[in-house]
């Protein structure tokens, strides 16, 4: 047992604790929090319902863990309060984490756009976190199913109900655990097959914190029957594209799938898309396709339109575009206005998604615990001393790419 004294205007209150800190969730946020708390001499316990810790780290980056981004800043996060993200990022930057990896001699490389991946596998990151936890004397218990978290009541542990921080009781398939502080690092709703749940939101509401509506983010987009038939015929093709929605735009890979559209550019824009809104896709960014088609007509008039489009696009996609436009013959068979319309369509393909693939494949959850109720420097609930929320459970969602 650990004993803490909390003086206040009414005198002293004595609270008996099993641990200084109990962290719910053995993912990236929970383990990093445990390490830092342990380094400060706190007695830390991490609880998770999974059989293995850090499952989301394990599957991230195609198994190589895209662990951070060299260009990370607050502008790469979606939140109702951008200033919160800016302040939070100042507490621990991407460079701090890179230095941690270097101290463990973990080899990594930049793939593109500042995205850093392990040369080996995601297990390198997990092993590093386990090693750091052990060095900080952090206790980790897996397959722990938590039923409830509550404030201490008027039992023997509490001598004064006016105590500023009365501590918490964590209850589940184990003997009740008493802790001075509890950190909720349970993540969001994305990828339920690895154990995602809304437990963190339930606890936030119980203690009076507001929630920002949640929805899937970084998720493939789906389409109606006609567009879906086209996507199925093009399944497996990828192009470098620019995709826009509202004021957001991303220039990265786009992938046709048997369910719709995916790839980094689509995952990015999905976080900015709302039901009913169109997205605009530039299939050949940086090239004026209308001008190119008209110039090609003058230079090689007998060339068919499909071959001309194939200069920049995969043959199957070029053929599909020609079929949709009814322009499968030679360039000379079409007037400049028709070629201009086709070129414009290639640079500004307008689509209205029917929806997304949902939390099943979403990489993140947008929304969550409203940051208005949290301190941006400590992540502690402003009206509940000792209760903290970190990671994906909070309303602060990053771009794809670390």
Protein language model annotation of sequence segments:
Residues 17-19, 172-181, 250-251:
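Core beta-strand elements of the Rossmann-like FAD/NAD(P) dinucleotide-binding domain
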Residues 22-24, 146, 177-190, 254-257:
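Short hydrophobic core segments
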Residues 51-53, 58-59, 67-74, 107, ...:
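An anion/pyrophosphate-binding glycine-rich loop and adjacent beta-alpha core
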């Amino acid at each position: 047992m650990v004993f803490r004294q909390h003086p206040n205007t009414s005198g002293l209150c004595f609270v008996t604790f099993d641990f200084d800190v109990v962290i719910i969730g053995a993912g990236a946020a929970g383990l990093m929090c445990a390490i830092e708390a342990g380094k400060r001499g706190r007695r830390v316990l991490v609880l998770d319902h999974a059989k293995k810790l850090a499952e989301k780290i394990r599957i991230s980056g195609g198994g190589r863990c895209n662990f951070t981004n060299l260009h990370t800043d607050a502008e790469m996060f979606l939140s109702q309060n951008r200033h919160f993200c800016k302040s939070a990022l100042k507490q621990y930057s991407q460079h701090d984490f890179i230095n941690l990896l270097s101290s463990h001699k973990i080899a990594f490389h930049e793939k593109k756009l500042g995205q850093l991946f392990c040369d080996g596998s995601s297990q390198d990151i997990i092993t590093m976190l386990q090693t750091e936890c052990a060095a900080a004397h952090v206790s980790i218990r897996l397959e722990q199913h938590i039923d409830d978290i509550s404030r201490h009541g008027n039992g023997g542990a509490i001598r004064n109900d006016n105590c500023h921080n009365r501590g918490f009781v964590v209850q589940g398939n184990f003997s009740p655990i008493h802790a001075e502080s509890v950190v909720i690092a349970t993540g969001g709703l994305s990828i339920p097959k690895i154990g995602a749940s809304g437990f963190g939101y339930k606890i936030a509401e119980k203690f009076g914190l507001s929630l920002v509506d949640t929805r899937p983010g970084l998720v493939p987009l789906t389409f109606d029957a006609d567009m879906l038939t086209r996507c199925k015929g093009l399944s497996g093709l990828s192009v470098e594209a620019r995709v826009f929605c509202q004021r957001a735009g991303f220039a990265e890979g786009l992938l046709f799938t048997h369910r719709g559209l995916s790839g980094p550019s689509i995952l990015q824009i999905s976080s900015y898309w709302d039901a009913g809104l169109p997205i605009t896709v530039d299939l050949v960014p940086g090239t004026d396709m209308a001008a190119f088609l008209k110039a090609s007509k003058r230079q090689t008039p007998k060339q068919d339109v499909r071959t001309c489009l194939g200069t920049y696009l995969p043959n199957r996609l070029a053929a599909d575009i020609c079929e949709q436009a009814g322009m499968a013959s030679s360039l000379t068979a079409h007037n400049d206005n028709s070629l201009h319309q086709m070129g414009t369509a290639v640079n500004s393909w307008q689509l209205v998604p029917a929806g997304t693939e949902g939390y099943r494949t979403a990489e993140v959850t947008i929304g969550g615990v409203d940051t208005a109720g949290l301190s941006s420097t400590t992540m502690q609930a402003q009206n509940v001393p000792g209760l903290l929320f970190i990671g994906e459970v909070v309303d602060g969602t990053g771009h794809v790419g670390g």
